[in-house]
Amino acid sequence: MSCTRGWRLILLGLLCVGLLGTRGQDESRKVSVQYNPGSSDTSVNVVHVRAVGDGNTIHYVWSTLGTPTVLLIYTHSETSQLQVNWTKLLSPAPQGALRVEPEESVSYATALLFTRIFEYQDVNNTANFSGTDEKYFYPPYNLSEFLWENANATVNATSLSANLTGSNTTDPSGSFHNGSVSFRISAYNTSGRDSSPPRLRHTANCTKLEFLVSGVRPRGNNSRFALEMVTIEKEGRRKMKSVLSIDDEYTPTIFEMMQLVAVAPNSSHARGFLQWKSVAYGSPSGSRADLLPCQLYPLQPLNATFTATSIAHAYFGDDLADAYNLEAFNISFGIADGDFYDKHEFLSWSALIGYGDPPRDSFSILVICIMAVALGTPLLLLIIGTVLVTAVRHKVYPNYQPIN
Protein backbone atom coordinates (compact mmCIF):
# COMPACT_ATOMS: atom_id res chain seq x y z
CA MET A 1 0.00 0.00 0.00
CA SER A 2 2.80 2.43 0.93
CA CYS A 3 4.68 1.66 -2.31
CA THR A 4 1.61 2.30 -4.42
CA ARG A 5 0.91 5.56 -2.62
CA GLY A 6 4.51 6.69 -3.13
CA TRP A 7 4.39 6.02 -6.85
CA ARG A 8 1.12 7.89 -7.15
CA LEU A 9 2.55 10.92 -5.38
CA ILE A 10 5.63 10.98 -7.62
CA LEU A 11 3.62 10.67 -10.83
CA LEU A 12 1.12 13.28 -9.68
CA GLY A 13 3.91 15.71 -8.85
CA LEU A 14 5.58 15.27 -12.23
CA LEU A 15 2.29 15.71 -14.06
CA CYS A 16 1.73 18.96 -12.19
CA VAL A 17 5.20 20.17 -13.22
CA GLY A 18 4.61 19.18 -16.84
CA LEU A 19 1.21 20.80 -17.06
CA LEU A 20 2.16 23.96 -15.19
CA GLY A 21 3.69 25.46 -18.33
CA THR A 22 0.43 25.21 -20.24
CA ARG A 23 -1.96 26.50 -17.58
CA GLY A 24 -3.69 29.70 -18.62
CA GLN A 25 -2.53 29.36 -22.23
CA ASP A 26 -5.36 27.22 -23.61
CA GLU A 27 -7.43 30.04 -25.15
CA SER A 28 -9.00 29.18 -28.49
CA ARG A 29 -9.71 31.52 -31.40
CA LYS A 30 -11.70 31.53 -34.61
CA VAL A 31 -9.04 31.99 -37.28
CA SER A 32 -9.37 32.89 -40.97
CA VAL A 33 -6.77 33.49 -43.69
CA GLN A 34 -7.49 35.82 -46.61
CA TYR A 35 -5.41 36.81 -49.64
CA ASN A 36 -5.46 40.43 -50.86
CA PRO A 37 -8.72 41.38 -49.09
CA GLY A 38 -10.87 43.57 -51.32
CA SER A 39 -8.71 43.18 -54.44
CA SER A 40 -8.23 40.76 -57.32
CA ASP A 41 -4.75 42.12 -58.11
CA THR A 42 -2.15 39.36 -57.80
CA SER A 43 0.89 41.51 -58.59
CA VAL A 44 1.40 42.06 -54.85
CA ASN A 45 0.94 39.81 -51.83
CA VAL A 46 -1.06 40.77 -48.76
CA VAL A 47 -2.09 37.89 -46.49
CA HIS A 48 -4.46 38.75 -43.66
CA VAL A 49 -4.77 36.36 -40.71
CA ARG A 50 -7.69 37.27 -38.44
CA ALA A 51 -7.85 35.53 -35.05
CA VAL A 52 -11.01 36.27 -33.06
CA GLY A 53 -11.02 35.50 -29.35
CA ASP A 54 -13.21 36.25 -26.36
CA GLY A 55 -13.72 40.02 -26.58
CA ASN A 56 -10.67 40.69 -28.77
CA THR A 57 -9.11 40.12 -32.19
CA ILE A 58 -5.51 39.76 -33.33
CA HIS A 59 -4.80 40.84 -36.92
CA TYR A 60 -1.64 39.63 -38.66
CA VAL A 61 -0.92 41.31 -42.00
CA TRP A 62 1.89 39.76 -44.04
CA SER A 63 3.11 41.40 -47.22
CA THR A 64 6.00 41.37 -49.68
CA LEU A 65 5.21 44.88 -50.92
CA GLY A 66 8.59 46.55 -50.49
CA THR A 67 10.41 44.94 -47.58
CA PRO A 68 8.73 41.68 -46.42
CA THR A 69 6.83 42.59 -43.27
CA VAL A 70 4.32 41.28 -40.76
CA LEU A 71 2.06 43.67 -38.86
CA LEU A 72 0.49 42.56 -35.58
CA ILE A 73 -2.54 44.60 -34.49
CA TYR A 74 -4.46 43.75 -31.31
CA THR A 75 -7.98 45.10 -30.75
CA HIS A 76 -10.41 44.76 -27.86
CA SER A 77 -13.27 44.02 -30.26
CA GLU A 78 -14.49 40.78 -31.82
CA THR A 79 -15.81 42.64 -34.87
CA SER A 80 -12.77 44.75 -35.83
CA GLN A 81 -11.95 44.61 -39.54
CA LEU A 82 -8.92 45.34 -41.72
CA GLN A 83 -9.54 48.03 -44.34
CA VAL A 84 -7.21 48.40 -47.35
CA ASN A 85 -7.16 51.36 -49.73
CA TRP A 86 -5.54 49.60 -52.65
CA THR A 87 -5.12 52.70 -54.79
CA LYS A 88 -3.17 54.40 -52.05
CA LEU A 89 -1.30 51.23 -51.05
CA LEU A 90 0.12 50.83 -54.56
CA SER A 91 0.96 54.52 -54.90
CA PRO A 92 4.32 56.16 -54.13
CA ALA A 93 2.75 57.52 -50.90
CA PRO A 94 1.02 54.56 -49.19
CA GLN A 95 0.70 56.20 -45.76
CA GLY A 96 -2.77 55.58 -44.35
CA ALA A 97 -3.64 52.84 -46.84
CA LEU A 98 -4.03 50.25 -44.07
CA ARG A 99 -6.23 50.69 -41.02
CA VAL A 100 -8.29 48.61 -38.63
CA GLU A 101 -11.82 49.72 -37.81
CA PRO A 102 -13.12 50.75 -35.42
CA GLU A 103 -9.86 52.60 -34.87
CA GLU A 104 -10.60 53.19 -31.19
CA SER A 105 -10.61 49.42 -30.63
CA VAL A 106 -6.89 49.15 -31.42
CA SER A 107 -4.89 48.90 -28.20
CA TYR A 108 -1.53 47.70 -29.56
CA ALA A 109 0.31 47.46 -32.87
CA THR A 110 3.81 46.37 -33.83
CA ALA A 111 5.71 45.18 -36.89
CA LEU A 112 8.60 42.94 -37.84
CA LEU A 113 10.50 43.58 -41.07
CA PHE A 114 12.80 41.09 -42.82
CA THR A 115 15.34 43.37 -44.44
CA ARG A 116 18.51 41.60 -45.58
CA ILE A 117 20.24 38.23 -45.86
CA PHE A 118 23.98 38.26 -45.24
CA GLU A 119 26.32 35.69 -46.76
CA TYR A 120 29.92 35.49 -45.60
CA GLN A 121 32.94 33.29 -46.15
CA ASP A 122 33.76 31.43 -42.94
CA VAL A 123 37.38 30.72 -43.82
CA ASN A 124 38.31 29.37 -40.37
CA ASN A 125 35.03 27.52 -39.74
CA THR A 126 34.35 29.44 -36.53
CA ALA A 127 30.74 30.50 -37.29
CA ASN A 128 31.67 33.90 -35.83
CA PHE A 129 29.42 36.25 -37.80
CA SER A 130 30.15 39.43 -35.83
CA GLY A 131 33.89 38.73 -35.68
CA THR A 132 34.38 38.08 -39.39
CA ASP A 133 36.37 40.66 -41.35
CA GLU A 134 34.33 42.72 -43.81
CA LYS A 135 36.42 41.49 -46.73
CA TYR A 136 34.88 38.03 -46.32
CA PHE A 137 31.31 39.30 -46.74
CA TYR A 138 29.53 39.08 -50.06
CA PRO A 139 27.10 41.88 -51.04
CA PRO A 140 23.96 41.31 -48.91
CA TYR A 141 20.66 40.29 -50.46
CA ASN A 142 18.16 43.12 -49.98
CA LEU A 143 14.78 41.40 -49.68
CA SER A 144 12.92 44.51 -50.86
CA GLU A 145 14.50 43.95 -54.28
CA PHE A 146 13.28 40.37 -54.63
CA LEU A 147 10.66 39.24 -57.12
CA TRP A 148 7.91 37.49 -55.16
CA GLU A 149 5.62 34.80 -56.54
CA ASN A 150 1.83 35.02 -56.42
CA ALA A 151 0.96 33.57 -53.00
CA ASN A 152 -2.75 33.11 -53.67
CA ALA A 153 -2.39 29.43 -54.60
CA THR A 154 -0.54 28.72 -51.34
CA VAL A 155 -3.24 30.08 -49.02
CA ASN A 156 -4.92 27.16 -47.26
CA ALA A 157 -8.01 27.99 -45.23
CA THR A 158 -8.03 24.51 -43.67
CA SER A 159 -4.44 24.34 -42.45
CA LEU A 160 -4.42 28.13 -41.85
CA SER A 161 -1.20 28.55 -43.80
CA ALA A 162 0.39 30.42 -46.69
CA ASN A 163 3.79 30.73 -48.38
CA LEU A 164 5.61 33.85 -49.53
CA THR A 165 8.36 32.79 -51.96
CA GLY A 166 10.79 35.04 -53.81
CA SER A 167 14.10 35.18 -55.61
CA ASN A 168 16.76 37.68 -56.57
CA THR A 169 16.58 38.11 -60.34
CA THR A 170 19.34 40.75 -60.54
CA ASP A 171 22.15 38.82 -58.86
CA PRO A 172 25.00 38.64 -61.42
CA SER A 173 26.27 35.37 -59.94
CA GLY A 174 23.02 33.57 -60.80
CA SER A 175 22.75 32.11 -57.31
CA PHE A 176 18.95 32.06 -57.50
CA HIS A 177 18.72 30.26 -60.84
CA ASN A 178 17.19 27.20 -59.14
CA GLY A 179 16.73 28.56 -55.63
CA SER A 180 14.44 30.74 -53.56
CA VAL A 181 13.80 32.35 -50.19
CA SER A 182 10.47 31.64 -48.49
CA PHE A 183 8.45 32.65 -45.48
CA ARG A 184 5.99 29.95 -44.50
CA ILE A 185 3.12 31.25 -42.39
CA SER A 186 1.12 29.02 -40.02
CA ALA A 187 -1.71 30.25 -37.79
CA TYR A 188 -3.25 28.39 -34.86
CA ASN A 189 -6.75 28.34 -33.39
CA THR A 190 -5.77 26.58 -30.18
CA SER A 191 -2.76 25.57 -28.09
CA GLY A 192 -0.54 22.68 -29.10
CA ARG A 193 2.87 21.68 -30.41
CA ASP A 194 3.98 22.07 -34.01
CA SER A 195 4.47 18.84 -35.95
CA SER A 196 7.69 19.85 -37.73
CA PRO A 197 11.11 20.51 -36.16
CA PRO A 198 11.86 22.18 -33.82
CA ARG A 199 8.36 21.26 -32.55
CA LEU A 200 7.65 24.70 -31.03
CA ARG A 201 4.89 24.88 -28.47
CA HIS A 202 2.28 27.47 -29.50
CA THR A 203 -0.95 29.08 -28.33
CA ALA A 204 -3.84 30.62 -30.25
CA ASN A 205 -2.25 34.02 -29.58
CA CYS A 206 0.60 33.53 -32.04
CA THR A 207 1.50 32.48 -35.56
CA LYS A 208 4.60 30.69 -36.80
CA LEU A 209 6.98 31.95 -39.45
CA GLU A 210 9.47 29.61 -41.07
CA PHE A 211 12.33 31.24 -42.93
CA LEU A 212 13.78 29.02 -45.65
CA VAL A 213 16.69 29.31 -48.06
CA SER A 214 16.45 26.45 -50.54
CA GLY A 215 18.47 25.65 -53.64
CA VAL A 216 20.28 28.99 -53.61
CA ARG A 217 23.79 28.42 -54.90
CA PRO A 218 26.35 29.79 -52.40
CA ARG A 219 28.92 32.28 -53.63
CA GLY A 220 31.69 30.33 -51.90
CA ASN A 221 32.50 26.80 -50.73
CA ASN A 222 32.34 27.73 -47.03
CA SER A 223 29.41 30.14 -46.96
CA ARG A 224 27.24 30.83 -43.95
CA PHE A 225 24.15 33.02 -43.69
CA ALA A 226 22.56 35.50 -41.31
CA LEU A 227 19.15 37.20 -41.35
CA GLU A 228 18.61 40.86 -40.49
CA MET A 229 15.27 41.96 -39.02
CA VAL A 230 13.82 45.24 -37.76
CA THR A 231 11.25 45.67 -34.98
CA ILE A 232 8.86 48.62 -34.58
CA GLU A 233 7.39 49.70 -31.24
CA LYS A 234 5.34 52.80 -30.39
CA GLU A 235 6.30 52.85 -26.71
CA GLY A 236 9.30 51.23 -25.11
CA ARG A 237 11.68 48.86 -26.81
CA ARG A 238 12.32 45.18 -27.29
CA LYS A 239 14.23 43.25 -24.66
CA MET A 240 16.23 40.09 -25.29
CA LYS A 241 15.55 37.21 -22.95
CA SER A 242 17.13 33.77 -22.79
CA VAL A 243 15.04 30.99 -21.26
CA LEU A 244 16.90 27.80 -20.36
CA SER A 245 15.32 24.36 -19.96
CA ILE A 246 16.52 20.97 -18.76
CA ASP A 247 14.50 19.29 -21.51
CA ASP A 248 15.98 18.82 -25.01
CA GLU A 249 13.53 16.13 -26.12
CA TYR A 250 12.55 17.88 -29.36
CA THR A 251 15.86 19.65 -30.07
CA PRO A 252 18.72 17.42 -28.86
CA THR A 253 21.62 19.35 -27.28
CA ILE A 254 19.69 22.65 -27.55
CA PHE A 255 18.43 23.87 -24.17
CA GLU A 256 17.88 27.56 -24.92
CA MET A 257 14.74 29.42 -25.97
CA MET A 258 15.21 33.03 -27.10
CA GLN A 259 12.60 35.77 -26.80
CA LEU A 260 12.31 39.37 -27.93
CA VAL A 261 9.64 40.88 -25.71
CA ALA A 262 8.26 44.40 -26.01
CA VAL A 263 8.78 46.32 -22.78
CA ALA A 264 7.10 49.65 -21.96
CA PRO A 265 7.58 51.19 -18.48
CA ASN A 266 4.05 52.58 -18.12
CA SER A 267 2.05 50.06 -20.13
CA SER A 268 -0.92 48.40 -18.46
CA HIS A 269 -1.65 45.88 -21.21
CA ALA A 270 0.18 42.95 -22.77
CA ARG A 271 2.48 43.43 -25.74
CA GLY A 272 4.02 41.53 -28.62
CA PHE A 273 6.79 38.95 -28.66
CA LEU A 274 9.04 36.98 -30.97
CA GLN A 275 10.13 33.57 -29.69
CA TRP A 276 12.32 30.82 -31.12
CA LYS A 277 14.47 27.86 -30.13
CA SER A 278 18.17 28.56 -30.71
CA VAL A 279 18.35 26.12 -33.58
CA ALA A 280 18.03 25.96 -37.36
CA TYR A 281 18.27 23.03 -39.77
CA GLY A 282 20.53 22.38 -42.73
CA SER A 283 18.29 19.84 -44.48
CA PRO A 284 14.55 19.45 -45.18
CA SER A 285 14.41 16.35 -42.95
CA GLY A 286 15.25 18.37 -39.84
CA SER A 287 17.38 15.52 -38.53
CA ARG A 288 19.72 15.76 -35.55
CA ALA A 289 22.72 15.38 -37.85
CA ASP A 290 21.78 18.57 -39.70
CA LEU A 291 20.95 20.65 -36.63
CA LEU A 292 22.47 24.15 -36.71
CA PRO A 293 22.67 26.29 -33.56
CA CYS A 294 21.83 29.93 -34.20
CA GLN A 295 23.15 33.06 -32.54
CA LEU A 296 21.26 36.27 -31.70
CA TYR A 297 23.17 39.57 -31.78
CA PRO A 298 22.38 42.74 -29.78
CA LEU A 299 19.62 45.11 -30.82
CA GLN A 300 20.78 48.29 -32.55
CA PRO A 301 18.75 51.57 -32.70
CA LEU A 302 17.91 52.35 -36.30
CA ASN A 303 15.71 55.45 -36.47
CA ALA A 304 18.19 57.85 -38.05
CA THR A 305 19.24 55.45 -40.81
CA PHE A 306 15.95 53.69 -41.58
CA THR A 307 14.98 54.06 -45.25
CA ALA A 308 13.27 50.77 -46.14
CA THR A 309 9.68 51.00 -47.39
CA SER A 310 7.04 48.44 -46.47
CA ILE A 311 3.41 48.08 -45.42
CA ALA A 312 4.55 49.38 -42.03
CA HIS A 313 4.49 52.85 -43.61
CA ALA A 314 0.97 52.19 -44.90
CA TYR A 315 -0.23 51.56 -41.35
CA PHE A 316 1.97 53.68 -39.06
CA GLY A 317 2.27 56.70 -41.40
CA ASP A 318 4.86 59.32 -42.28
CA ASP A 319 6.31 59.72 -38.80
CA LEU A 320 7.43 56.10 -38.54
CA ALA A 321 11.11 56.88 -38.03
CA ASP A 322 10.41 59.78 -35.66
CA ALA A 323 7.51 58.63 -33.49
CA TYR A 324 8.36 54.93 -33.17
CA ASN A 325 11.31 52.97 -31.83
CA LEU A 326 13.04 51.02 -34.57
CA GLU A 327 15.69 48.43 -33.72
CA ALA A 328 17.62 46.06 -35.97
CA PHE A 329 19.08 42.70 -34.99
CA ASN A 330 20.76 39.76 -36.68
CA ILE A 331 20.51 36.01 -36.29
CA SER A 332 23.32 33.89 -37.73
CA PHE A 333 23.17 30.18 -38.46
CA GLY A 334 25.90 27.60 -37.97
CA ILE A 335 28.35 26.13 -35.49
CA ALA A 336 32.14 26.10 -35.32
CA ASP A 337 33.69 23.13 -37.13
CA GLY A 338 30.24 22.30 -38.52
CA ASP A 339 28.99 21.77 -42.05
CA PHE A 340 28.60 24.68 -44.41
CA TYR A 341 25.46 25.66 -46.31
CA ASP A 342 26.65 23.99 -49.53
CA LYS A 343 26.25 20.48 -48.04
CA HIS A 344 22.51 20.46 -48.76
CA GLU A 345 21.94 24.03 -50.02
CA PHE A 346 19.15 24.33 -47.49
CA LEU A 347 18.45 26.39 -44.37
CA SER A 348 15.33 26.48 -42.19
CA TRP A 349 14.64 28.59 -39.10
CA SER A 350 11.31 28.89 -37.27
CA ALA A 351 9.91 31.43 -34.82
CA LEU A 352 6.62 32.45 -33.23
CA ILE A 353 5.24 35.98 -33.38
CA GLY A 354 2.34 36.78 -31.11
CA TYR A 355 0.65 38.85 -28.45
CA GLY A 356 0.71 38.46 -24.67
CA ASP A 357 2.91 36.04 -22.75
CA PRO A 358 5.20 33.82 -24.87
CA PRO A 359 4.28 30.12 -24.71
CA ARG A 360 5.94 28.21 -21.88
CA ASP A 361 7.37 24.84 -22.81
CA SER A 362 6.38 21.73 -20.89
CA PHE A 363 7.46 18.11 -20.51
CA SER A 364 5.82 15.52 -22.72
CA ILE A 365 4.07 12.48 -21.23
CA LEU A 366 7.04 10.33 -22.33
CA VAL A 367 9.52 12.49 -20.44
CA ILE A 368 7.24 12.57 -17.39
CA CYS A 369 7.08 8.75 -17.37
CA ILE A 370 10.86 8.45 -17.72
CA MET A 371 11.36 10.90 -14.86
CA ALA A 372 8.83 9.00 -12.76
CA VAL A 373 10.76 5.77 -13.27
CA ALA A 374 14.13 7.44 -12.66
CA LEU A 375 13.01 9.17 -9.49
CA GLY A 376 10.58 6.55 -8.28
CA THR A 377 12.79 3.46 -8.52
CA PRO A 378 15.25 4.52 -5.76
CA LEU A 379 12.34 5.53 -3.54
CA LEU A 380 10.60 2.22 -4.20
CA LEU A 381 13.75 0.27 -3.32
CA LEU A 382 14.14 2.32 -0.15
CA ILE A 383 10.54 1.61 0.87
CA ILE A 384 10.89 -2.12 0.13
CA GLY A 385 14.17 -2.27 2.07
CA THR A 386 12.62 -0.49 5.03
CA VAL A 387 9.63 -2.86 5.04
CA LEU A 388 11.90 -5.95 4.89
CA VAL A 389 14.17 -4.73 7.68
CA THR A 390 11.19 -3.90 9.86
CA ALA A 391 9.60 -7.30 9.17
CA VAL A 392 12.81 -9.16 10.04
CA ARG A 393 13.29 -7.25 13.27
CA HIS A 394 9.78 -8.07 14.44
CA LYS A 395 9.68 -11.67 13.26
CA VAL A 396 8.89 -14.24 16.02
CA TYR A 397 10.85 -17.49 15.84
CA PRO A 398 8.74 -20.44 17.28
CA ASN A 399 11.78 -22.55 18.34
CA TYR A 400 13.41 -19.77 20.29
CA GLN A 401 13.42 -20.30 24.09
CA PRO A 402 14.27 -17.26 26.15
CA ILE A 403 17.02 -17.71 28.77
CA ASN A 404 15.94 -17.02 32.33
Curated annotation (Swiss-Prot):
The chain crosses the membrane at residues 365-385. Interacts (via lumenal domain) with lysosomal protein MFSD1; the interaction starts while both proteins are still in the endoplasmic reticulum and is required for stabilization of MFSD1 in lysosomes but has no direct effect on its targeting to lysosomes or transporter activity. Residues 1-24 form the signal peptide. Its main location: membrane. The keyword Transmembrane applies. Required to protect lysosomal transporter MFSD1 from lysosomal proteolysis and for MFSD1 lysosomal localization. It holds the Pfam family NCU-G1. One of its GO terms (cellular component) is lysosome. This is Glycosylated lysosomal membrane protein B. The keyword Thylakoid does not apply. The gene is glmp-b. One of its GO terms (biological process) is protein localization to lysosome. It comes from the Eukaryota. Belongs to the GLMP family. It is found in: Lysosome membrane.
